Amino acid sequence: MGAKQSSPAANGRTRAYSGSDLPSATASVNGRTAAVLRYNNSQGASGATSAASASSSAAVASQFISSRTRSVGPSARPQSGINIPNSGAYSSADSGNSTPEEPGGERERSTGAPRLVIGSLPAHLSPHLFGGFKCPVCSKFISSDEMDLHLVMCLTKPRVTYNEDVLSKDAGECAICLEELLQGDTIARLPCLCIYHKGCIDEWFEVNRSCPEHPAD
């Protein structure tokens, strides 16, 4: 028997599926692996981007919260538009000694500082402060407006009479000469029951027409 000859159809079929024309299992596996890696890389990149954006948002939120906390923290105090005046009229010692029930007027009087208000005193109580004069008859201070009337009344007023007597016992000091009234001295007893040495009261009545101790009578 002779050698077999291969048919052209069989050779052509063999060439069509031989060599690099046929996809190998390794190439298929490598292609699938590359696709999986590309998918994983894309997923990882998108995840990293999402994580970065989330972390930046959290940082902004924490910064905003911390700024709000600082602005409304315990050191910040609300300022009211109402200003309460300081009670600077009284010192700390006065405020410590005063009680809540004590009125303001009593606190001012307790300080002992007299307060003079101009016009609070009538003119006839302090005429020497307002251009008054001293009456030569009764030695009283009179305002200028009442000078003429007062002089007429003093000059026309009758002299005070007295009773002459002899002192039976010591009676203290004479208000005119400032000497002692001794037993046996001649005295003058006025209607107001004041007693003086007779010589002292006579000299007094030469200028004045009233008792030395009661000029208004």
UniProtKB/Swiss-Prot annotation:
Q: Which PROSITE patterns match?
A: ZF_RING_2
Q: Which terms are listed as keywords in the entry?
A: Cell membrane, Cell projection, Endosome, Lipoprotein, Lysosome, Membrane, Metal-binding, Myristate, Synapse, Transferase, Ubl conjugation pathway, Zinc, Zinc-finger
Question: What does it catalyze?
Answer: S-ubiquitinyl-[E2 ubiquitin-conjugating enzyme]-L-cysteine + [acceptor protein]-L-lysine = [E2 ubiquitin-conjugating enzyme]-L-cysteine + N(6)-ubiquitinyl-[acceptor protein]-L-lysine
Polar residues compositional bias, start-end: 68-100
Look up the record and give one Gene Ontology term from the biological process aspect: protein K48-linked ubiquitination
Q: What is its main location?
A: membrane
Provide the E.C. number(s) assigned to this enzyme.
2.3.2.27
- Is Lipoprotein among the key words of this record? yes
User: Which pathway features in its UniProt record?
Assistant: Protein modification; protein ubiquitination
Q: Which InterPro entries does the record match to this protein?
A: Znf_RING, Znf_RING/FYVE/PHD, ZNRF_ubiq-protein_ligase
Q: Where in the cell is it found?
A: Endosome membrane; Lysosome membrane; Presynaptic cell membrane
Annotated region described as Disordered, given as residue ranges: 1-27, 63-111
Top enzyme class of this protein? transferase
Query: Lipid attachment points, N-myristoyl glycine kind?
Result: G2
Identify the Gene3D superfamilies for this entry.
Classic Zinc Finger, Zinc/RING finger domain, C3HC4 (zinc finger)
Per its UniProt entry, which superkingdom is the organism in? Eukaryota
Gene Ontology cellular-component terms listed: cell projection; cytoplasm; endosome membrane; intracellular membrane-bounded organelle; lysosomal membrane; membrane; presynaptic membrane
Q: Name one Pfam family in it.
A: zf-RING_2
**Which parts of this protein are zinc fingers (RING-type)?**
174-215
Question: What is its membrane topology?
Answer: Peripheral membrane protein
Gene Ontology molecular function: any one: ubiquitin protein ligase activity
Instruction: Please describe what this protein does.
Output: May play a role in the establishment and maintenance of neuronal transmission and plasticity via its ubiquitin ligase activity. E3 ubiquitin ligases accept ubiquitin from an E2 ubiquitin-conjugating enzyme in the form of a thioester and then directly transfer the ubiquitin to targeted substrates.
Q: What is this protein called?
A: E3 ubiquitin-protein ligase znrf2
> Where does this protein come from, organism-wise?
Danio rerio
Q: What is the lineage of its organism?
A: Eukaryota, Metazoa, Chordata, Craniata, Vertebrata
